[in-house]
């Protein structure tokens, strides 16, 4: 059985896209299992940058099967725009398969997302306003519309009519917002359904079949561990489960099929939006990290909050997803620092913290326990062998592995595919 998986260990933006692309080159099948178009990642191929939001990273290769699984929520308009944009850049989406069980983002989901966020004022959680949360809420409430419903007109009209009536009451009565139009939505989604029809299939069966045939299957995670609905810094989280268990349910295969689980660790820490961030640096260090790392959101363009690497977070992620290996990214961004700090523990009210706090008040009150390591103060972006890395760079990543208890698997020293150092077989 040849499977591999990529998980973000922090708050997202760890460089998962680059690691996924690196592994995808050797895969036969690439599977997206959760999330929606709220998370973007950039993949650089032949010095050309591709910004992907819904499409699996394997779409950039002609010989890969690409699957958008059951756990993904799909905005058909956005997906079709992404396919069109890809084709304009000389790539084809003919290898794409979309789960007939996946839930569909509707215009009223986006309207509700925007209205709800606006109503919160200073208490907003930083949603991307793409309708992801309201779509997942409908899924849980068992009133959602699935891809398969788009091809059963009677069912689709019935579900759409119910939802439009209910959602318009919420929009107009609760939020004093504009209602959505049933006829316009129906007409648009009939067109979307026809355009996507050739891609729709039973992806659960497709993934299982590929595994049984011993094909190399890569499970591609979106968002990251600290945004997990159950285990992240709730309520500043996403609406799905971007951990290994979420990939199992989202792709429709049992957990024993998930092997070679890589946890992607950015060599420093970033976060977009509100929520606790124990190692955040609201100073020159933070500004330098943001400038050197070009830390702005792929989808939103928002400046990311920056700070020192927090190994309490990474260690927590390692346990939640039973990580097999670490993939350290953006190590080159730290090239100019004379010294570096990593958080190896928290203190709360003067006492060492065991595990990871559930209470946001406790987490915000935690004081990071830092270790200081010497920097390497040299350009490592051209290095292609682990042994050629400066001694202090090796000590930095090896300390990460030591504290988290997870061995190193990949070290990235730049955005391009060839700026990657493999330490293990990825399948």
Name every feature range the model reports, one short phrase each.
Residues 1-427:
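Non-transmembrane, aqueous-exposed alpha-helical and coiled segments at domain scale
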